[in-house]
């Protein structure tokens, strides 16, 4: 097949380390499986929040592409990102945490059972609920704060100059909160 446009040659230093594709795939599978389990839990009366992350599994690749020091403000369906980051940390239990969140357990480390929330201080992921675009102004503020003197930055576990990653869905792009950010 002939193309109407030239393709750039791949960069020579883009080889993925051995095993990395498998770890990304594992995070994607865990994200999808948690969605299936949450729906079963809802059907049996053991879960109360079933808006899952199906269709957003490739956010695991994004998590692998950025530094753990980078601050993340995630779309509420981007559990694969959090799962991927947590897989590299022995201090996090992403599967347990998400299941606690779906079941509105008071043991949920992020919301204490009030809502299904993605987020983790350990993983530099700001807590985010399903409110459309509400995290965009926070992301802009965090990005602005990076340029402030270190004494004013409140991100305790950020060791290097981070970037701020913010993901959002199509409904957010036309929301006034997004436009304001």
Which residues does each PLM region occupy?
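Cofactor-/ligand-binding subdomain signature composed of acidic, glycine-rich
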Residues: 1-47, 69, 96
